[in-house]
Structures are given as structure tokens and as C-alpha cells.
């Protein structure tokens, strides 16, 4: 009896078969990415509770969730119709930007993906932005919304009408409202919206028109307007958040139109006259 060696038949992969295998590999890669992201979030939560830094760590964990969610979204590309017909304000966040219109605001990633959409219905909407979150508030009302890049974090109603808001890089929020006993009240909240300090401004100190947190989120620059001997005066204060006692840095007979921190110790401000300046 003769034995013949049998060769296994060669498998011819059709184009459809190749495409199917490639799609399967892509699904596997996406599952691995999701499992890795879930593991990172779980480890972050374990570390937060193990170290006892729950309050601060929860805020950081929410920012981490946002960053992972944004990274996993497909790149939509540009141009895009953002749905804001009349732009009132534009602010930059980490990896994205937020646009404010008359009736709504929208957040888009730098790669063209829509991340968040808020229909506010506020009569006089305004934005204040930090690094990874922003505040949408009503300047003729008493409601504000703290938003991350992808979702609502907190909604707060103040006792008196809102004048101004500011957001620190680490998520702290400062608000200026009307006040019965004084001309205004400035309140600073932690990233979890727990009140940290308050300052009742007198008529001599003025009403804040500009606020800017320092890069380290530990100090707040405040430009407040008042009247002295029939003249308009702007007082520039520095408020250390760990002490709560405002320090008067400068006083001038002009509005401060803009101010910002050039570094951790240098604050730049501009006014209509040639007396623009910097202080440290």
C-alpha cells in the first residue's frame, strides 16, 4: 500500500475576510484602551480614599475622567458649525474652547468634537473660565453653573444678584454679589463648591469689576471701583486665600480695562490712560 503525503489546502483570504479581520483587531484595540482607562480611574479612586484627600481628589478625578473621555473621542476635524449664531464670548480651556451665545453655550475640542452643550435661557449670560472648568452665570439673576469640559458639576443659587465670577486653575470659584450691609460681597469657594472665605466690601473699597486668580490658585487680584471726592477711583487689591486679609496694591483715577498674571509674582493691568502698569 502506498501512502501519499497530503498537503493542507492553502487558504485564500478574500478582500472581505481581510477587512473583517482588521475591524476585529480595531475592536480589540478599543477594548484594551477602555480597560486601561477604567483601571486608571479605579486606581485614582483607591489612592484618593487611601490618602484621605477625598475632596480635592474627587475634583481631580473628574478632570481626569474628562481628559480620558476627550482623548477617546474620534477627531471630527474642521470646519464645524458650532450652532452659536451670534458669539458673545469665547474662552480657552485645556484641550478645548467654550463659545457663549445669547441662549446657549457650547464646548468643542481642539480636534472638532462637540463635548458639551448648555441651553441656559439667561437674560445676561457671561462666562468665567479656568483651566479645565468654567462658570456660566446670569448677570441679572442669581444662578450660576459650574461646568467641566463635558458635563455639569454644580448649580448654585446665590442669595443676592450676581455681578462677577472668576475661576482658578485648580477649580476654585470666586463670586461677587450685591450685599445689604455693604456695597458688595466677594465669596471664594473650593473646587467642591464649599465656601472658603468671604469679604464684604465697603463703599470706600468699591465694587469689583475685574478678578483674576494667580497661576498657583492661592491668590486673587481684585480691581474694585468707587468714588472719592467726586472722582472715580479704581482700587487694586491682592487677596491671599490662606489669610483672607486683602492688601491694597494700587489706587488710580482710571478704570482697569484688563489684568492678567504674567508669572506667579507679576500682575499686569491696562487702563485708558498711559498709566498702564505692573505690580508684583
Regions found by a protein language model. Give the residues of each.
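A short beta-strand motif characteristic of beta-propeller blades
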Residues: 72-81, 113-118, 151-157, 195-201, ...
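Repeated scaffold domains used in trafficking and secretory/extracellular systems
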Residues: 84-89, 122-129, 160-167, 206-212, ...
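Structural motif
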Residues: 143-145, 182-187, 229-237, 275
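N-terminal Lys/Arg-rich, disordered targeting/topogenic segments
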Residues: 1-32
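Hydrophobic beta-strand positions that form the internal "hydrophobic ladder"
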Residues: 97, 134, 173-174, 220, ...
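Hydrophobic membrane-insertion alpha-helices, especially the h-region
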Residues: 36-51
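Conserved small/polar residues in nucleotide/adenosyl-binding loops
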Residues: 269-278
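Beta-strand-rich domains and repeat architectures in extracellular enzymes and scaffolds
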Residues: 75-103, 119-127
